[in-house]
A protein has these predicted regions:
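Conserved interdomain linker/interface between the two RecA-like ATPase lobes of SF2 helicase motors
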Residues: 212-271
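Conserved RecA-like ASCE ATPase "motif II neighborhood" in helicase/translocase motors
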Residues: 105-110, 117-162, 170-185
C-alpha cells in the first residue's frame, strides 16, 4: 500500500483477511455459501481497507500465501461509485496494476468466465433486464449471468464477490431495485441461472443496512465490525465542529478555506 493504515484499519484488515480465508475454506468443506460482513462508520476509510484486502489476497501477507489467480468482483449501485473505488485502488494499492482493474462494459464485455488475477467492477444498472449485458444477441456470446455462473462452476476456489452497500448512489425506488439485484448474488437467482456466490464480502456503514441485505439468506455470516469509538480515537472522526460567524468582510475567505478543507476530507475518507 502507498499509505500507512491507521491502527484500527490494520486490525480490521487482519480480521477481514482471516474471516475471508475461513469463509473460503468453509465453502469448500461444506459447499454452503459464505458471507463476510464488514461494517464501519462513514469516515473510517472502508474502501482503503478493502483495497488493502484485495492486495493481500493477490500478493499475500505475513499470515497467508499469495493467490495471484484470485478473481475479485466489486458491485455497487452506481458507475460513478465504481470509478471512485477503482481510482482509489489505483492510487493507494501500489502492487495492483491499473490493467488488472476492469470496468465491465455493456458494449465490449463478453467472456465465458472472468479472467484470473483481475478486479472487475459492476454496477446494478448494468444488471437490469434492459441491459445489453443480460441479453443474448447483437453479437453477444455470453450474458453476464452466464459469465458469473461459469466462473462459480469453474473457479469457485478463487472467486471473491464484494458488495459495496456502504456507498449508495441510488435513492427511493431505484435504491430498492439495486438492493434486490444485490441480493441475487447472496441468495442466487433461478430466473437468471446463477447460484449464490461462494464468498461474498459485504461492506456497509450500519449493521441495519447489511441485515436488510442478507435477510432470508441461508449463508453462514462472519462479522467484522469497526466501532465509532475506534475511528474517533484515531482522530478521523470528531465529536464536535465549532462554527463561528465572523464579520462580513472575512466571511468569503473563511468559507473558501472551509470548503477546500471539506473537499479534501471527502476525497480522502468518504470512500
Amino acid at each position: 500500500m502507498r499509505v500507512e493504515l491507521f491502527p484500527f484499519q490494520k486490525r480490521a484488515l487482519a480480521d477481514i483477511r482471516m474471516k475471508t480465508a475461513e469463509a473460503m475454506g468453509s465453502y469448500h468443506r461444506t459447499h454452503a455459501p459464505q458471507v463476510v460482513s464488514f461494517t464501519a462508520p462513514t469516515g473510517a476509510g472502508k474502501t482503503i481497507i478493502m483495497s488493502a484486502l484485495i492486495e493481500a489476497i493477490l500478493f499475500g501477507d505475513e499470515q497467508y500465501m499469495e493467490q495471484p489467480d484470485a478473481i475479485i468482483v466489486w458491485l455497487s449501485d452506481s458507475p460513478q461509485l465504481n470509478e471512485q473505488s477503482k481510482q482509489k485502488i489505483d492510487s493507494k494499492a501500489d502492487k495492483i496494476k491499473l490493467s488488472q482493474c476492469v470496468t465491465v462494459s455493456e458494449e465490449s464485455f463478453d467472456k465465458e468466465v472472468f479472467e484470473d488475477g483481475h478486479v472487475y467492477f459492476l454496477n446494478t444498472q448494468k444488471l437490469s433486464v434492459t441491459s445489453k449485458l443480460t441479453k443474448n444477441g447483437d453479437g453477444r456470446t455470453y450474458t453476464i449471468w452466464e459469465t458469473l455462473a461459469n466462473t462459480v462452476r469453474e473457479k469457485s476456489d478463487r472467486l471473491y464477490f464484494i458488495i459495496d452497500e456502504a456507498h449508495r448512489g441510488m435513492q427511493g425506488r431505484e435504491a430498492s431495485k439495486a438492493t434486490t439485484i444485490m441480493q441475487k448474488f447472496i441468495k442466487g437467482s433461478d430466473s437468471d441461472g446463477i447460484p449464490p456466490m461462494p464468498v461474498v464480502i459485504g461492506m456497509s456503514a450500519t449493521t441495519q443496512r447489511f441485515n436488510a441485505l442478507v435477510e432470508g439468506t441461508s449463508s453462514t455470516i462472519h462479522k467484522s465490525i469497526v466501532t465509532t469509538d475506534e475511528v474517533r480515537a484515531s482522530g478521523l472522526l470528531k465529536d464536535r465542529i465549532v462554527i463561528t460567524y465572523p464579520e462580513e468582510g472575512t466571511v468569503n475567505n473563511d468559507m473558501a478555506i472551509l470548503q477546500a478543507a471539506a473537499d479534501e476530507w471527502k476525497e480522502k475518507w468518504e470512500h
